[in-house]
């Protein structure tokens, strides 16, 4: 089930320029500054990994912007040390999945693709501010955003193949659109990692800044976008997405089934066992 966010306070934009906290759960918070929403994901710990419950929280955060006509831009960020190392393979929910019926397993494996669609479907531009490692599911989530601002501390990779997992969440066609087929092959199949400068050269990162400055740079970009006519921005984003990503969901339709097959494989079980020792 989708996590129920705890609403701390909600102020109308006309009454306060800064809405201190519009939504807060244990790991995900949304702060409003006029028409800009800043979503912070901070689980604590070195990996900032995503459990299944946290994936639901992140999806709920994205869906909270539906019908928000005051919204002009969204900034998504992790901690000041790491964006995210991806899925938490030590999540005990994996053990429960083994006991589910096949239909329930397929339904459960929809969480990742649903998270990707929720962020890709936000009607206003989304800027991802990245410090430190952005790996696996972190890379997938970042690929759903419209812009990526990376600090010099950022590094990008997708070690899924090393743990016998597919690359899902509808992210493969997004990566291909951003960096091309061969760079996608290298990062997914050959274990290549990118520095911030390499990500900028390939087209994954739109801006590179000094370490610790990603959120500031992303907010500067958000301020610029928020100053443009909101309706025009929304229409142009929709035009771009319709042209660039028209077949994304068709070409990644088997994401959740591939994910399910991966979870049931002996190779994945062996790889996961190393995380839960």
Regions found by a protein language model. Name each.
Residues 117-231:
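Crotonase-fold acyl-CoA enzyme core
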Residues 11-13, 17-79:
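Conserved CoA-thioester-binding segment of acyl-CoA-metabolizing enzymes
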Residues 13-34, 191, 195-197, 212, ...:
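C-terminal alpha-helix plus adjacent terminal tail
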Residues 61, 111-122:
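Catalytic-core regions built around general acid/base machinery
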Residues 78-115, 164, 247:
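Glycine- (often His-adjacent) and acidic-residue-rich active-site loop
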Residues 80-85, 134-136, 240-243:
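Short, active-site-adjacent cap segments at secondary-structure transitions
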Residues 39, 43, 57-58, 76, ...:
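Terminal peptide-recognition signature
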């Amino acid at each position: 089930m989708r996590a129920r966010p705890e609403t701390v306070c909600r102020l109308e934009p006309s009454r306060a320029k800064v809405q201190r906290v519009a939504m807060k759960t244990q790991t995900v918070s949304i702060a409003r500054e006029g028409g800009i929403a800043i979503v912070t994901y901070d689980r604590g710990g070195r990996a900032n990994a995503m459990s299944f419950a946290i994936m639901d929280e992140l999806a709920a955060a994205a869906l909270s912007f539906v019908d928000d006509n005051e919204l002009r831009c969204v900034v998504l960020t992790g901690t000041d040390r790491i964006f995210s190392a991806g899925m938490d393979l030590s999540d005990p929910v994996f053990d429960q999945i083994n006991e589910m019926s096949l239909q329930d397993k397929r339904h459960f494996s929809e969480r990742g693709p649903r998270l990707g669609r929720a962020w890709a479907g936000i009607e206003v531009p989304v800027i991802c501010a990245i410090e430190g490692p952005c790996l696996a599911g972190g890379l997938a989530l970042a690929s759903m955003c419209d812009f990526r601002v990376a600090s010099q501390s950022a590094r990008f990779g997708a070690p899924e193949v090393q743990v016998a997992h597919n690359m899902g969440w509808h992210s493969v066609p997004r990566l291909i659109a951003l960096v091309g087929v061969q760079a996608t092959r290298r990062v997914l199949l050959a274990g290549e990692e990118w520095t911030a400068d390499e990500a900028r050269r390939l087209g994954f990162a739109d801006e590179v800044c000094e370490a610790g400055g990603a959120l500031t740079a992303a907010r500067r970009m958000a301020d610029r976008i928020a100053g443009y006519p909101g309706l025009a921005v929304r229409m142009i984003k929709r035009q771009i997405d319709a042209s660039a990503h028209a077949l994304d969901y068709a070409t990644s339709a088997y994401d959740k089934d591939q994910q399910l097959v991966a979870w049931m494989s002996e190779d994945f079980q062996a790889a996961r066992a190393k995380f839960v020792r």
